[in-house]
Every structure is written in C-alpha cells, then in structure tokens.
Amino acid sequence: MSLISIVCLIPFGLIGAVNPIITLSAYAVLGGMYLLVVPLFLFYWMNNRWNVMGKLERLFIYGLVFLFFPGMILFAPFLNLRMNGKEGS
C-alpha cells in the first residue's frame, strides 16, 4: 500500500511528503510564520502607517489581523503601540 501511495505522489513532486522529518519541518516553518513572523510584520506595518492608511489598505490589514489573531495575541502584552502625545505643550 505504501508503494502505491509513493508512486501516486511522484508525478506531483511530493515524494518528500512521506519523510516525517520534512513533514515536521514544514509544520514548524509554517507555524513559525503564522505565530511569529507575520504578526510582527503586521504590528510594524500598523505602527508606521496608522495615520496615512487608505480605506482599502486598512480593510486589508484588519482582515490580516483577524486571520493572524493568535500570533497577535502572543505579542500584544509586550508591544506598546499607543500614539505619542503632543510634545512641548
């Protein structure tokens, strides 16, 4: 049975999917992207462009925040994104 599944995967270039090390590595990379890389990029993007974003960009960013919410929650206690107050008053 395993030989049949390997033969069926060869035309698609998925022979590496049978190796558990490659599979676990792929899960680790995708999980790291989902929980660490993309949420940090979203925090950076929102912090820099908050006052100049257009309607469609804001809608797109809010959609990504909804999609990557678990990673955003991980970093929320450690990042301060409050606006700076008026200086020199």
Curated annotation (Swiss-Prot):
It is a multi-pass membrane protein. It is found in: Cellular thylakoid membrane. It is an enzyme of class 7 (translocase). The chain crosses the membrane at residues 29-46, 59-79. Its EC number is 7.1.1.-. Belongs to the complex I NdhL subunit family. NDH-1 shuttles electrons from an unknown electron donor, via FMN and iron-sulfur (Fe-S) centers, to quinones in the respiratory and/or the photosynthetic chain. The immediate electron acceptor for the enzyme in this species is believed to be plastoquinone. Couples the redox reaction to proton translocation, and thus conserves the redox energy in a proton gradient. Cyanobacterial NDH-1 also plays a role in inorganic carbon-concentration. This is NAD(P)H-quinone oxidoreductase subunit L. It comes from Prochlorococcus marinus (strain NATL2A). The gene is ndhL.
